[in-house]
Amino acid sequence: MTRIKINARRIFSLLIPFFFFTSVHAEQTATPAKPVTVEAKNETFAPQHPDQYLSWKATSEQSERVDALAEDPRLVILWAGYPFSRDYNKPRGHAFAVTDVRETLRTGAPKNAEDGPLPMACWSCKSPDVARLIQKDGEDGYFHGKWARGGPEIVNNLGCADCHNTASPEFAKGKPELTLSRPYAARAMEAIGKPFEKAGRFDQQSMVCGQCHVEYYFDGKNKAVKFPWDDGMKVENMEQYYDKIAFSDWTNSLSKTPMLKAQHPEYETWTAGIHGKNNVTCIDCHMPKVQNAEGKLYTDHKIGNPFDNFAQTCANCHTQDKAALQKVVAERKQSINDLKIKVEDQLVHAHFEAKAALDAGATEAEMKPIQDDIRHAQWRWDLAIASHGIHMHAPEEGLRMLGTAMDKAADARTKLARLLATKGITHEIQIPDISTKEKAQQAIGLNMEQIKAEKQDFIKTVIPQWEEQERKNGLLSQ
């Protein structure tokens, strides 16, 4: 049995989180003041916090683009009819937050401020300019309109003012002064009984990360960001909430099912895991204290893999060596991934079988219970896999969610087999060749050549116009 050291702050678990999880500075006062002014230019704070700034800037080294659709073409089918079927890359460093949302095929190729497929809310986790605009225009003023409206305004990459009260005198003296810069995040924390001002400093550290590393949806006519935590944070609680308000992110173009798309629910899954239950915060593993050249300790803002700073992270509490813990990580990741693929295979078949039933004349009433099962199965699968580090944040919860997703998908397929039989269809429904991303995209009718050409034109013509306005308005340091 693994022996655990007792830390003065709390008992750590036997596991370690593994993937990137946005975090914040470890030192802070218990009740930081609310921001008075939002300065979005990160370079402004380099003289006061040089080590933190340089380590934050080093997130530009995390530059590799990994195409998740190419790795797993099944995703294209599951997200048919949704922008994620066009383009889905794994996360890069914070230094690429603005670039990546501008260049992804998901945001389309708008020609003007009123054009394009997505709302302003899609900027909300990308930049301290979001906090600046909310302060300037209010939430309603910030959220209204299309994503392209924010192009000339959202320019500085995720940074200082997203997590810190940079206007505070204490921050100027070198203190962290954590804050929730997104009012909707503060309301969500209050909804689960965690008002930020009353939280302890370890809770606050993770709550700041939880402004963005959460599940959310776009609410109301203005498409404002809201966290679906009114009924609780477990997958079933959020599913119940979404069903109650009859919300869907999109309708799958094959099965015509009203679907839910999970975002990146690290806060929810971390909370459900042993680290979260013992209040081992995001920064303990992803932003440890390290020494600068003069031997002074500071919080490393190059958010990343705990194994890259093993002595400052895992070894603080675990007695195993690095290789032993890496083996634990690999085994848990493999277990999650194996079940993930099995659930995806069932869902792919369910979507195509539902399409066959509709093509054969199935009615809305006949399809409703089947589509409910597909919706719930894919929601549970998505919430499990959208949190990239769930295999270490909450592996048991991840396997549980995937297990219930498998059950729901099986229920859908059983009902589909019976319904198809009533339409005279007893043979197996053939699935087209989806062995590559390109073939899967072709199977759902995407004209990727046109989509990519339009995006390249947008990058060459519209983004330079935005950048010219940014420089003219003094929104960038350079």
Swiss-Prot record:
Binding site for substrate: Y216, H264
Pfam families named in the record: Cytochrom_C552
Binding site for heme c 3: H94, C209, C212, H213
Top-level EC class as recorded in UniProt: oxidoreductase
UniProt: heme c 2 binding residues: C160, C163, H164, H301
Residues noted as binding heme c 4 in the record, renumbered to the chain: C282, C285, H286, H393
Residues that coordinate or bind Ca(2+): E215, Y216, K261, Q263
Pathway(s) this gene product operates in, as recorded in its UniProt entry: Nitrogen metabolism; nitrate reduction (assimilation)
Record-listed E.C. numbers: 1.7.2.2
Keyword terms: Calcium, Electron transport, Heme, Iron, Metal-binding, Oxidoreductase, Periplasm, Signal, Transport
Reactions catalysed, as given in the entry: 6 Fe(III)-[cytochrome c] + NH4(+) + 2 H2O = 6 Fe(II)-[cytochrome c] + nitrite + 8 H(+)
Lineage: superkingdom: Bacteria
Subcellular location(s) of the protein: Periplasm
Keyword check for Metal-binding: yes
GO molecular function per UniProt: calcium ion binding; heme binding; iron ion binding; nitrite reductase (cytochrome, ammonia-forming) activity
Protein residues bound to heme c 5: H275, C314, C317, H318
Family: Belongs to the cytochrome c-552 family.
Protein name: Cytochrome c-552
Organism: Escherichia coli O17:K52:H18 (strain UMN026 / ExPEC)
